[in-house]
Design a protein with these regions (language model features):
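A short beta-sheet element
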Residues: 30-91, 100-112
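Non-catalytic DNA-recognition/assembly elements of restriction-modification systems
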Residues: 1-30, 118-146
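A common structural junction motif
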Residues: 94-97, 136-137
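Feature detects amphipathic, helix-rich regulatory segments
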Residues: 3, 12, 19-25, 43, ...
C-alpha cells in the first residue's frame, strides 16, 4: 500500500456576500455546515470541507456542488482515491496537529497538501468503505434497541 500527498485538490473558499441568494441552487458551507444558498459554486461534488479558521477538526462531507466560505477549505479527491474513503480518512485524522497558530485554530493549504494518506488500490478502498458502512449500520441497530 502506498501513501499519497497529491491525491486531492485543496480549494480555497471565498466571501459569499456577492453570490448569496436565498433561492440559490447551491448551498453555501462553512466549517459548521450550511450558511445559505448561492447561484454559483466553487467546489464540485464529493468534497470534504475542513475549517481554515476556528473549527478545524470537524470534516463535513458534501455530495453536491457548493460554495465554501473563506474560513473553510474544500478538499476534492482525484481519481486515485474514493471520495468516501477520503472522507473517512479525514474524519479520523487529527487536523489540530497541523495548527501552528497561537490563538484561533488555523490550517493552511500547504499543511493540508502535506498530509500522507494511506492509499491502497481503489478496489480495496471501496471494500474498506463498505466495511465502515456495515459497522455504522450495526451501530445504528444497537442504538435503536437501547
Amino acid at each position: 500500500m502506498g501513501k499519497a500527498k497529491r491525491c486531492r485538490k485543496v480549494i480555497h473558499g471565498r466571501n459569499q456576500s456577492a453570490v448569496i441568494n436565498p433561492n440559490g441552487q447551491y448551498p453555501i458551507y462553512g466549517s459548521g455546515g450550511i450558511m445559505g444558498y448561492a447561484d454559483d459554486y466553487l467546489c464540485p461534488e464529493h468534497c470534504t470541507i475542513v475549517g481554515r479558521k476556528g473549527t478545524i477538526n470537524n470534516p463535513i462531507l458534501v455530495e453536491t456542488k457548493f460554495w465554501n466560505v473563506d474560513t473553510a477549505f474544500g478538499l476534492h479527491p482525484n481519481e486515485t482515491i474514493d471520495y468516501l474513503y477520503f472522507h473517512y480518512f479525514c474524519k479520523g485524522f487529527d487536523f489540530t496537529k497541523l495548527d501552528k497558530s497561537t490563538t484561533l485554530p488555523s490550517l493552511t493549504k500547504t499543511s493540508l497538501e502535506q498530509i500522507d494518506i494511506p492509499l491502497p488500490p481503489l478496489n480495496e478502498q471501496k471494500l474498506i468503505v463498505q466495511k465502515i458502512k456495515d459497522i455504522f449500520t450495526q451501530l445504528d441497530k444497537i442504538t435503536a434497541e437501547l
